[in-house]
Amino acid sequence: MAQNEYAVRLEHVTKTFGTVVANKDVSLGVRRGEILALLGENGSGKTTLMNMIAGIYFPDEGEIYVGDEAVTIRSPRDALDLGIGMIHQHFKLVDVFSATENIALSMGGKDKFDLKRVHDKARAICEKYEFNLDLNQKVYEMSVSQKQTLEIVKVLYRGADILILDEPTAVLTPQETEKLFSVIRNMKADGKAVIIITHKLHEVLSISDRVAILRKGEYVGDIATKDADEAKLTEMMVGEKVELNIERPEPVDPVKRLELSHLTVRSAEGITVLDDASFTVYGGEILGIAGISGNGQKELLEAIAGLQPTESGASIEYFAPDADTPVQLVGKSPKAIREAGIH
């Protein structure tokens, strides 16, 4: 395909921070109407590379092309003026403003003072791409997925034809992820170029048309998603074959070490953040606590460590090795809990 059919491409781009080489001689591009997944392990240089397209960093070497024109992007405003918008993991929104007000705030010139015009144009964008967003709602009332949707609407409002999403599903439920993917497919159908930074292989295979892989800051290559599977992508990421199916034998004669019963924790505002949790942890096993960030994981661990007060009726018993009776942790200080053997 001719180079001018790329919406944006990088040629021999290098970026260093002191003695650390974040990206080395990287050349890649994304086509119009294509969803490109940028894949790599943590620290492989994915976000740094995209931050150069978005105007947050400036390359030490190499060129960035939008269409067939070499461009200089020294700020996010430069990027937006070229039709490039990046949606970061941490949203840049004012909580006490409505969706419409946040969109207006991101604009320059006098148009931002005409909130009705901003609202009407934003509503048309929402209808076109089937966004579920109340433009009059305050940001602090929104779910995480609604805030993310607002960030996407903001860059589309500014005329972005190239969208970069940095780990967009990290804070979403599976249902919210599927809604986001539906929106991304709508944008692709409209001719937008979309780059998704991720390390979730099953999502890469679900949403992308092509996968580009970085390893230790260098471009390894790309592969059409239809020709890829998790084993192939993993091998390209780490440079060798990886066994994805690990057999974990059951512990032999497991011994109870920690037992939680009816654990309820409320926030300072009186909101229940942990509701009647009960489970047992055994020696010789690793117990994973899964869930979207903000669903009580932090409060659970803090309650065990004595850093969170619990509601009446809760019990946390620690069965220390060689001890005849368990130690009740509820009501004990963090120091006493550490001395009991919980770290």
Residue ranges and their predicted role:
Residues 2-343:
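Glycine-rich phosphate-binding loops of nucleotide-dependent enzymes
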